[in-house]
Amino acid sequence: MQTYVALLYSIILGEGRRVVMADLKAMAEGLGLKNPRTLVATGNLVFETKATDIVKLEQRLEVAFEKTFGRHVDIIVRRADDWLTLAAGNPFPAESAATPDQVAVRVMRKPVPAEAAATLQAYVGKDEKMQAVGGDIWIVFSRATPSSRLIAATSHKRLGIGTSRNWNTVRRLAEMFGG
């Protein structure tokens, strides 16, 4: 059995409705996924299943999500060992220790090309930092300027399918995998 994490892009279903994590777990169980569990109510699902193709697993989850909740949501899946590598690759450990809610990673379905990551530097604010690691985008956001230009610059339209998680979530998911 292989352990995976599924990251939902959004848990907002519209009209003030949100995905209930118990319903998300039930959906996973209905797919035959073992030991499904969630971390915080922001769309982080950890589970076990036989080793399988990530793209096919993402597609299965997305189809089941739309059938269960009536809305398509992009879902990015990573193997536990890949998540541990992502967490260990955090290029901003000092900032993560000081302000973990201000450090985030944009986890990408497909690695961001180096040239696309380089163009993001133009959007980095005075008190911000950005670095691409392993095809994902790490950002240190400024507390002084809460409306970062990087948020729009890292959108699906510009970089492809991805979803962001702050350092607290990254770390806690890694701990769920024994990291």
Segments (PLM) and residue ranges:
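Surface-exposed, charge/polar-rich loops and edge strands
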Residues: 2-179
